[in-house]
Amino acid sequence: MDEFVERLAGIGVPALVFLIIMSTTGLTGAAAITATLALLGPGGMIGGVITLIVIGAGASVISKYGYSAIITATCKKIMQKDNLTQEQMCEKIDKYPITKGLKEKVKTKIREA
């Protein structure tokens, strides 16, 4: 079931982005598809297709691991790279524009490490 949800997110999010952009073009049919792909990415239609693939891959990874796991892993890498203590990293996390619940969850994971 988890793999199904992961695949669905990998397909659904790019499709949703595509439909939203397509609805803003005011065009229909092939012209709408062409205009949407050209608007989505750098380099015209090919860039748009690549952008949708990257969005799908990102959505798939996020659905597989979850936001908190990705943010926690990123914070641990920042701690190692910048040679920060747990307390310094927790202060840095408090400044991030994320929910209080997610901040507490990430800080707990950092303190456990």
Model-predicted segments: where are they?
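Small-residue-rich hydrophobic membrane-insertion segments
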Residues: 4-70
